[in-house]
């Protein structure tokens, strides 16, 4: 099968759109015609080298939605014509983590950065004689995807494609950071640091969970304004600027929950985040740091004495097969904002402009639409 795809040939290079060849589906595999792909910051981490790929060139993209057009042998959960949301977190339903309700940690996740197919390890994507890797075993920046059945979640066919795409990564991750990992409760004061595609959804997750105050922190005024539309009650440009007013409005208690969702996580952000976290409070680290980032500084004495905790968070600590349908149901009922997340749509050929707009702070979420 022929397909267009956005390829990254090395660290620091631009995406190049070219024609590729995709093999037919093997057992347990499906072919998906992409309808919408989300432009997540994690793909930018691959460009900058903060997230190292095991092989170049690679097909970018891990957030998206599409229609099943072909299935391989032994596929039982979907059939041609089904609409699906892509899941960069696979869910086999058989490993220890899946059967104990923690499919976010499915053992298949160890294969996310493998070069070959998740199913049998073969190379199935090619540019001429050159084999191609794929971002998170997906590669949604392409007209067609060949993926494991375990990496798609069937959804209702009348839902708009952009909504189905957005819940496959950014929305689930941000919402879950507040609801599942931070465990925001009614009456809480919540701080979200970094208002991009993930942070904005942590804001609305905290609002939906009943937070009394939601403080959004971002240096970009446009993003602070958008945060107010999604449920923020206060905004500031930095944690340092927020500290004084936060102490005043909480009578010195500070934030019950702090969620870190900046574009790039840095170790030096931990202590300022703990400084605005209340006694017994929780600091959730969702943002991706460079794989080479080896240190985080904190006052370990005060950390222990104030009984605070730091939690890592992947995909909002949720369950893709449960969360994706649940979030789409909330969207259908008007409880979750998805349409308002899309700042601008692009063609595949405009992918580099889309990522430049993201770097310039112009987008909450850009999406690529396909014919």
Feature map (PLM): residue ranges:
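Glycine-rich phosphate-binding loop and adjacent beta-alpha segment
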Residues: 263-335, 370-371
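Cysteine-cluster motifs in flexible loop/terminal segments that predominantly coordinate metals
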Residues: 88-150
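Residues located in well-ordered beta-strands
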Residues: 4, 16, 21, 33, ...
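Short amphipathic alpha-helix with an adjacent loop that forms part of the alpha/beta core around
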Residues: 242-252
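Glycine-rich beta-strand-centered segment in the early N-terminal region that forms part
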Residues: 22-37, 50-99, 104, 112, ...
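Mid-domain Rossmann-like dinucleotide-binding core that forms the NAD(H)/NADP(H) cofactor-binding site
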Residues: 143-144, 150-152, 156-244
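C-terminal hydrophobic helical "lid"/dimerization subdomain
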Residues: 1, 240-241, 257, 271-275, ...
């Amino acid at each position: 099968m022929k397909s267009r795809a956005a390829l990254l040939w090395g660290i620091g290079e631009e995406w190049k759109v070219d024609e590729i060849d995709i093999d037919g589906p093997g057992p347990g595999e499906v072919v998906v015609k992409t309808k919408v792909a989300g432009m997540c910051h994690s793909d930018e981490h691959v460009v900058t080298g903060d997230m190292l790929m095991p092989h170049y060139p690679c097909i970018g993209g891990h957030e998206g939605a599409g229609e099943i057009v072909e299935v391989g042998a032994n596929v039982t959960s979907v059939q041609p014509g089904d609409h699906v949301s892509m899941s960069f977190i696979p869910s086999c339903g058989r490993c220890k983590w899946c059967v104990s309700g923690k499919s976010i940690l499915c053992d298949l996740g160890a294969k996310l950065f493998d070069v070959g197919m998740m199913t049998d390890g073969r190379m199935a994507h090619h540019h001429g004689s050159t084999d191609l890797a794929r971002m998170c075993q997906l590669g949604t920046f392409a007209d067609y995807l060949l993926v494991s059945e375990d990496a798609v979640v069937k959804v209702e066919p009348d839902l708009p494609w952009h909504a189905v795409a957005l819940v496959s990564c950014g929305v689930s991750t941000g919402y879950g950071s507040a609801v599942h990992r931070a465990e925001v409760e009614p009456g809480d004061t919540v701080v979200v640091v970094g208002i991009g595609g993930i942070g904005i959804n942590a804001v609305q997750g905290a609002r939906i969970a009943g937070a009394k105050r939601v403080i959004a922190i971002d240096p970009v005024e446009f993003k602070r304004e958008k945060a107010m539309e999604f449920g923020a009650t206060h905004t500031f440009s930095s944690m340092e600027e927020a500290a004084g007013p936060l102490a005043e409005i909480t009578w010195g208690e500070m934030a019950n929950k702090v969620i870190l969702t900046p574009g790039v996580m840095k170790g030096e952000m931990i202590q300022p985040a703990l400084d605005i976290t209340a006694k017994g409070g929780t600091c959730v680290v969702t943002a991706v740091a460079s794989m080479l980032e080896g240190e985080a500084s904190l006052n370990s004495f005060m950390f222990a004495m104030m009984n605070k905790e730091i939690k890592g968070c992947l995909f909002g600590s949720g369950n893709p097969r449960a969360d994706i349908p649940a979030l789409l149901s909330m969207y259908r009922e008007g409880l979750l904002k998805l349409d308002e997340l899309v700042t601008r749509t692009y063609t595949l050929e405009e992918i580099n402009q889309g990522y430049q707009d993201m770097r310039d702070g112009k987008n909450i979420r850009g999406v690529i639409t396909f014919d």
